Amino acid sequence: DYARELARSALDAMADGAYATPSGRQVNWSDDIERAKALKMSIRADDPLPTVEREPFARTIVQVRNETTMQAAATFVERGARPLALNFANGVHPGGGFLQGARAQEEVLCRSSALYATLAGDPMYDDHRRRPTPDSTDWMILSPDVPVFRSDDGISLEQPWLLGILTSAA
């Protein structure tokens, strides 16, 4: 299945620190992956929120658009913004079912970026697995600079771009 192949090739690209573009060029993104992993913050439900520098905005515009998370984020990045995408995540399995070829939002994010590298091994998943009830907490994982290397349809990009992703169990 194509989605499963994309998941395997994403894992290979992360492990190799490089991927091939449609033009045949090799893109070394190992530094981007390591930076994404180093910047990741696991925020327990009772942890204080990290402080951030706020930027004033002249106005807020709300739009409803028929786009995927990646399409919308790419549009904002092209306009010079730094979007933060909400990953509606599986609370017990990093990447949800992306390795099995599932096709929900989290799985597409993991197939198209190095998000999985920032989620794998996070203590949130073990904590949720140990819960006596089949639910999750408000624990979140902030991955502020995840390199995106593919479009939603699986086409490798000539140059990766960075996306902030907030992972929260849905």
Regions picked out by a protein language model, each given a short descriptive name:
Residues D1-A170:
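Macrodomain-like recognition of ADP-ribose-binding/processing modules
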